[in-house]
């Protein structure tokens, strides 16, 4: 489109570099600031140190919230991936009544404002004394993690040839057997991504936790939130950097799996 | 075969039960029970009228829509060229642009908001730089006002715009652009007459998804906004946490849900056309 016009394409390239830089800059700023040596956040830092990381690791309340988030996210990702896998398989293979309505309903938690979901869940939980109960919070997180799992697994299951399943069934495999011995292994890369991203969804979730956590199950985002409302303490930069590192690790794992799979496919054909 | 049908529903049942029991029913129950507190239908009606007549609430609804609109337009202006570059890039350039969009996309919203608080705060980076160069004598107020909210929210919602536009732009057949060029059309003409019309449904879908997410947004406006930037989500939270006025919270929820679901239905019509529907 811009072949004959080098100035125009140069301007576009410069703009794209600028915008991409702008997307990454805020994240880079937090990571750099987390290593600052001074008493408050200065950018660029005058000296480097790990003091904010040590302060985070030496604070029992921060560590407790990290542990709470980890436990809740682990339960939520296993549960939402298991439930989501079964549903995604039925949706991918089935032409059943109300299919579109069911899909729309299951994806709804992504669209409905989280404040509404959180308040409604709080209304329910307060009446049954479930505020602060970790498995319950994990279950609540599963509701918002489920759409993420469905979207990831839908695209994975689409790439699995239904003829493989038919072949297994003709050879005498039961439906459950097909699911376990054919679909599950083939969908494994997608399942790992689903686990990773539903874990992240729960680990980063703030609003539902804010209402359901109480004092007993304060999660990391809730702890950050409470501290941000008071003052911007630099420990948050260290905590944030850990969360950013976790995101990048998840993305690298996901990328590696996809790369391995595409290599597998290209060598097997 | 009927057995097949039954097993389909058995597979989908756990997910359905989860969403109905922990999402649909709680919302219906919260709204229903809160309104029932008022007693009669007449009482609900008069409460709804007084809520809609209240300056604070009307103001919040207005503010919410204005902020959501400005954020949507900003995201479109920034997202369109970014998405165009992504859709035409190959190899390493493609990976690099994608990383710049996907890493923020999957980073916690609280962390991304905090990042902008570090940049725009009173002792933030922008003020430190401007003060040290002598361009200003006292710190600028870049945060705790509408400017801060719009910057923070645009940053958080931009990836949704870029990824939706990307789906529409990737689907454009580059031979159409070459044909237009071959027939002597100038780059701007090609853009206005060929590329833009072909990606317009993506523009609509992306704008709608950003607007939908913006009107229900809580974290960024609550952290970066000032007293004049109370949005609907913040108001619902305050009615419950501070005033414990459940009926008003329920009425606000109905209003927010009505806007969200109407726009979501509209979004579906545009998004289905681009094929790359990811929400």
Protein language model annotation of sequence segments:
Chain B
Residues 26-30, 113, 161, 202-237:
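Non-cytoplasmic
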Residues 2-10, 48-57, 222-269, 273:
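Interhelical loop and adjacent transmembrane-helix boundary motif
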Residues 9-10, 25, 166-181, 193, ...:
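C-terminal transmembrane helix and the adjacent membrane-cytosol boundary/short C-terminal tail
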Residues 55-88, 154:
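Transmembrane alpha-helix signature in integral membrane proteins
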Residues 14-23, 73, 99, 103, ...:
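Transmembrane alpha-helices
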Residues 17-55, 59, 65, 119, ...:
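Short membrane-interfacial helix/loop motifs at transmembrane-helix boundaries
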Residues 45-46, 113-154, 188, 224-228:
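Membrane-interfacial helix termini and adjacent extracytoplasmic/periplasmic loops
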Residues 1-29, 95, 99, 257:
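N-terminal signal-anchor/first transmembrane alpha helix
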